[in-house]
Every structure is written in structure tokens, then in C-alpha cells.
Amino acid sequence: MNGIDISGHQKGIDLAIVPCDFVIIKATQGVSFISPDFQRQVTQALSVGKLTGVYHYANGAGVEGEVTHFVSTIAPYLDKVILCLDWEGDQNSKFADYRYCEAMLEAIKAKTGKIPFLYMSKSVCRQYKWEKARNYPLWAAQYKKQAPTTYTDKPWTDSKGFGAWSNPLIYQYSSVGRLSGYKNNLDLDICYLTPDEWISYTKGTQDLLQPVRPTLRRGDKNEYVRAWQEYLNANGYCCGNADGIFGQKTQDSLVKWQQDRGMESGYVGQKSWELLDS
């Protein structure tokens, strides 16, 4: 799915005419700031049928105060949106303390019963152990170049991995996206969930230690396929170039890997993911 994330910088954006499967909207920052245009943006997103998320930008002012401010602000929309925590270095006095971030994730889950996504730069994924955060779905960001672009189903990422996570569920690949219906820059994202899987996060029906990972079949094109290709190649099941495209060579190598583990389906389902983790 293709989508955007917005804040007060996109005040007045008409989400009815900007093409996107989903939109993630800044709600709050710190213990008192509410993003300008938040209520209008989230109300319109829901009214025009967009899959919708909201995020809080952490600033280190105190876990309880930040989470309380976030949850009280988004309360009218709580059962309709996914929740995200934005963890960046700018205007965040606790950025070097990854345990503060993990405490915020746990506090959001405790107050809402829902599992929040964690947004951060891909490089930050590798800076800390993230013992607890790794159990929360990752929304990672990395840009190859700052040139205007539109959606792509195969965004660039480096080969350094995502630290404690195998892959992100949402990936932000540009801050200078250009889409019809809006004349200025937009953050562009790709989401590797299905619409139903997204909705399960809005309802709080996902288990913390069992993040959704998609079923992969012949013809699929995404970063999950690329990760499997890299894994197969690294473990002696050569499938050629790790291009993110699930073709015949990838399927043949996968079948050999599965046969060596007592199964053979030719696609990546939950059993294959579980075997990969074991």
C-alpha cells in the first residue's frame, strides 16, 4: 500500500484528492503541543475512507505526561486509527536514552490496549539493542537522494539491515514526494500490511510478540521478498540477484530450503516465518 505522513506543515491539505491508500497524521508533541490542523486532517481522512494513523513526536518531557497528552488528544479516534511514536533527535532531550523510548511504547500500549508502531531513521535501528522495542512494529525511514519523486513499489534501502528488526512494516523513502492534488513536498511511505492487517492494529487485536508478517507468493515485489532472497543466498540456497521480485528462481530456492526443513509449499507463510526465527 502507498501512503503519506503529514503534520501542521501540510495544513489545509485536501485528503479527498491526494492519492493515498493510507495517511499517518501528527497529533501531538511533548506534553502540551497539538499539531495545527490535526482534528481537521484526521476527521477528513476517516470521512473519505483512508486507512489512518496518528503519531506523537517525543521530546523527553516525561513518559507519563507525554503519553497522557497523546492519548487524551486522540481519544475521539482511538478505535479507528493506528498509533505511532516518532523517535527523532531534533527537539528530543532523551534521544540518547533508548529506554525512555521503550517506556513510552509500553505506556501507550498500557493506556490504550493497542500496539504502537515505532518510527525512526534506519540508522538509529542499529545504534541500540532495543530489547523491548523490537517487539513493536517498525516504521523506518531512509532516503537515497533528495530529488522529487512519486510512489514506487521498490524503494531503495542500503544493505546494512534494520538492527533488532528483520524488516519494517512501514518504510518512509522520501521527504520530497510529489503527488497530484498537492503542490508542495510530501513524505512518501510504503506499507507491507494488507488493509485487513492494518485494521487489526486499529482494533487492538494484534499480539505484541507476534507482529504481522505478510504471506509472500510468486509475483510479489517488496522488501520482505528481498530480505528472504538475501537470507537464502547467504545460507547456500542461491536464488540470484536480491531484487525484491518473487520469481521462479526465488521460488525454487525457497522450496529447497523448505524441503530441508520438512515442508514444501512454494510460498512464504507463517510456518516459514516461524522456521526462519527458530
Question: How should these model regions be labeled?
Answer:
Residues 254:
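Conserved hydrophobic/aromatic packing and binding residues within compact polymer-binding modules
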Residues 7, 203-244:
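Acidic, Ser/Thr/Pro/Gly-enriched interdomain connector segments
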